[in-house]
């Protein structure tokens, strides 16, 4: 199979990359009605599979789960997830032929095998759904021409999809129809109904494309969302320990600090996050973030280039074929890092202390968000997509670190995201360790500036504020956050 994106001409590539429109709520007045009375069969019952299925059932859809016969016979976790929640469970051969919509929610590396297995069983004119387009875009899966192919991609982990639905809301969601597979012209009706059934329409849906979703998703998760948090955690912890800061305090400052800092980011963007600092600390964080942007821009651009060209995907798929040797090795190495093994502590850290003593963390967040956004938009991805795949998802990923450090982050994200995270962090960590960290001290990570006055030069502060507030990610962020009027607050501080 050929990489689908690479079969397109330049005009088609740019058109697909630039697809992203925030949809009016009026476009969802019929909610999930288009799929009511039809049979939805989900393949896979992990976090996304189970939680999307629960939401769809609660929205009035007929949902069942098709699993491999071995998973049923051995009563694996996927079988238990579905059965314990009262769903019908059957083999592919039993359930797939009845399905009007087959939703493939298995891990990326299983997609080719799953689709090749279920496609011959699907009835003529049925629909096939994805929540990530890697199989279509990067692997170039050829799907029967009578089948409609759609995507509904919630912009958060599966557990959050369920929790937001239960509180009467939802999570922002990208939806798309594969242009090669919409024979009856009903793709958008199916995608909108599926998105509404998960609750996504209440938080806002973006009309996107398979290409835009995949390329922006890969870039965000490799760099700012996962790779930067991993590299930052490792080098900041090392620095604090080397400077004599208590290991328990250093670890807790990082583990819960990312979550606390990005909580401010979620509600008011980079501007509000930086405003949580004192004037001297804000100027210092700004200066550090500018240095970081200069240092790390080539690395961010390389990841974007490798994603656009397909080099990243081919490299990762080669590791799939080698039994995930690199992935598993990098996972083990991460588990051995000092940050992952810092001693538990009962030390109290106030919310503001995370900002005051984590100035470098704030700088890393600003630099990482802006670099990822800039790399994406320079490659033809439009601002809305770039925002959701950088700034918007960052608090959700930071929350996983707060739960169980880097281990939890790498468990919750997909194998594709985990592989890309390691590729980035394995270069970013020594880069920061050698070229940046020697020049910083505990005044910006661990102890704070200890200033007795908030006084700064007015002209300098005005210039810093203008630069922060006039970045394009702040403009689109303010617009998109306006659509999300009921965002859930998360606990901060551990």
Curated annotation (Swiss-Prot):
Residues annotated as binding Mg(2+) 1: 217, 221
Q: Which InterPro entries match?
A: 6-PGluconate_DH-like_C_sf, 6PGD_dom2, KARI, KARI_C, KARI_N, NAD(P)-bd_dom_sf
| Stated name of the protein | Ketol-acid reductoisomerase (NADP(+))
Q: What class of enzyme is it?
A: oxidoreductase
Which residue ranges does the record assign to the KARI N-terminal Rossmann domain? 14-208
**Known pathway:** Amino-acid biosynthesis; L-isoleucine biosynthesis; L-isoleucine from 2-oxobutanoate: step 2/4; Amino-acid biosynthesis; L-valine biosynthesis; L-valine from pyruvate: step 2/4
Query: Does the entry annotate any disulfide bonds, and if so which pairs?
Result: none
Recorded E.C. number(s)? 1.1.1.86
What molecular function does GO assign, one term? ketol-acid reductoisomerase activity
Q: What does this protein do?
A: Involved in the biosynthesis of branched-chain amino acids (BCAA). Catalyzes an alkyl-migration followed by a ketol-acid reduction of (S)-2-acetolactate (S2AL) to yield (R)-2,3-dihydroxy-isovalerate. In the isomerase reaction, S2AL is rearranged via a Mg-dependent methyl migration to produce 3-hydroxy-3-methyl-2-ketobutyrate (HMKB). In the reductase reaction, this 2-ketoacid undergoes a metal-dependent reduction by NADPH to yield (R)-2,3-dihydroxy-isovalerate.
Which PROSITE patterns has this protein been placed in?
A: KARI_C, KARI_N
Q: Which residues form the active site?
A: 132
Similarity comment:
Belongs to the ketol-acid reductoisomerase family.
- Domain of life the protein comes from: Bacteria
> Where do the annotations place substrate binding?
414
């Amino acid at each position: 199979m050929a990489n689908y994106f690479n079969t397109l001409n330049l005009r088609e590539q740019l058109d697909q990359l630039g697809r992203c429109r925030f949809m009016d709520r009026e476009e969802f007045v019929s909610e999930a009605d288009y799929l009511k009375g039809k049979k939805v069969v989900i393949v896979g019952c992990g976090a996304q599979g189970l939680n999307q299925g629960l939401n769809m059932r609660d929205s009035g859809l007929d949902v069942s789960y098709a699993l491999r016969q071995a998973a049923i016979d051995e009563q694996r976790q996927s079988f238990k997830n579905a059965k314990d929640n009262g769903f019908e469970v059957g083999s592919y051969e039993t359930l797939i032929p009845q399905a009007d919509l087959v939703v493939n929610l298995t891990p990326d590396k299983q997609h080719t095998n799953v689709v090749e297995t279920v496609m011959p069983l699907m009835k003529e004119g049925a629909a096939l759904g994805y929540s990530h387009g890697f199989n279509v875009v990067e692997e170039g899966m050829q799907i029967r021409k009578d089948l409609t192919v759609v995507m509904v991609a919630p912009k958060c982990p599966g557990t959050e999809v369920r929790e937001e639905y239960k509180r009467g809301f939802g999570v922002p969601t990208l939806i798309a129809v594969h242009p090669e597979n919409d024979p009856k012209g009903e793709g958008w009706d199916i995608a909108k109904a599926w998105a509404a059934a998960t609750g996504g329409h209440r938080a806002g849906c973006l009309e996107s494309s398979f290409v835009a979703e995949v390329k922006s998703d890969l870039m965000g998760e490799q760099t700012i969302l996962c790779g930067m948090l991993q590299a930052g955690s490792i080098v900041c912890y090392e620095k604090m320990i080397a400077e004599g800061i208590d290991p328990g305090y250093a670890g807790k400052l990082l583990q819960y600090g990312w979550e606390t800092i990005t909580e401010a980011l979620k509600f008011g963007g980079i501007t509000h996050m930086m405003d949580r600092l004192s004037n001297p600390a804000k100027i210092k964080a700004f200066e550090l973030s500018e240095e970081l942007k200069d240092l790390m821009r080539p690395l961010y651009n390389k990841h974007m280039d490798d994603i656009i060209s397909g080099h990243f995907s081919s490299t990762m798929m080669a590791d799939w074929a080698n039994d995930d040797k690199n992935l598993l090795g990098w996972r083990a190495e991460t588990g051995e890092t000092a940050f992952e093994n810092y001693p538990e502590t009962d030390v109290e850290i106030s919310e503001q202390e995370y900002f005051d003593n984590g100035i470098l963390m704030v700088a890393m967040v600003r630099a990482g968000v802006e670099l990822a956004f800039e790399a994406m938009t320079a490659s033809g991805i439009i601002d809305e997509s770039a925002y959701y795949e950088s700034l918007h998802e960052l608090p959700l990923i930071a929350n996983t670190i707060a739960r169980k450090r880097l281990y939890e982050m790498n468990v919750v994200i997909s194998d594709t995201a985990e592989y890309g995270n390691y590729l980035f962090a394995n270069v970013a960590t020594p880069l920061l360790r050698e070229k940046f960290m020697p020049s910083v001290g505990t005044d910006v990570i661990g102890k704070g500036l200890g200033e007795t006055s908030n006084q700064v030069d007015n002209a300098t502060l005005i210039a810093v504020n203008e630069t922060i507030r006039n970045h394009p990610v702040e403009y689109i962020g303010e617009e998109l956050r306006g659509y999300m009027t009921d965002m859930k607050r998360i606990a901060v501080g551990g």
